[in-house]
Amino acid sequence: MDNIYSTLFGIFMGEGNRGEVVGHDEVNDYTIDTCYTIDQGWETAVWYKEYPMIIVARYPNKEMATQGHNEWVETCTTNRPTHAFSVQTDHIESFMEE
């Protein structure tokens, strides 16, 4: 983006808040998405079926984001978690309605 106005316009219009993707996988009805976001940097979001997503991790660089993404794919493949700590809310959140 060229300047602050285009950055703010992009955020307002919902553009530019999802940049480079290092992983997008669907396993056991979970979706695991790791990408660069304009507001928080590298982060992994996980959601189950159509329930709201949980931001489960943030990373300082692409390499750690890739590693973290792969770990979440493995977790959702083998453990099928029902809850996760949200780095966005600082609480343990449920992947499903209780």
Annotate the PLM regions.
Residues R58-Y59:
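Conserved aromatic
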Residues A65:
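Acidic-aromatic/histidine active-site loop/patch
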Residues F85-E98:
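Intrinsically disordered, low-complexity charged/polar segments
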Residues N28-I55, E71-E74, T78:
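Short aromatic-glycine-(Arg/Gly/Cys) micro-motifs in beta-strand/loop hairpins
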Residues M1-E43:
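Short N-terminal "domain-start" leader segments
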Residues T78-A84:
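Acidic, Ser/Thr/Gly/Pro-rich low-complexity segments that form flexible
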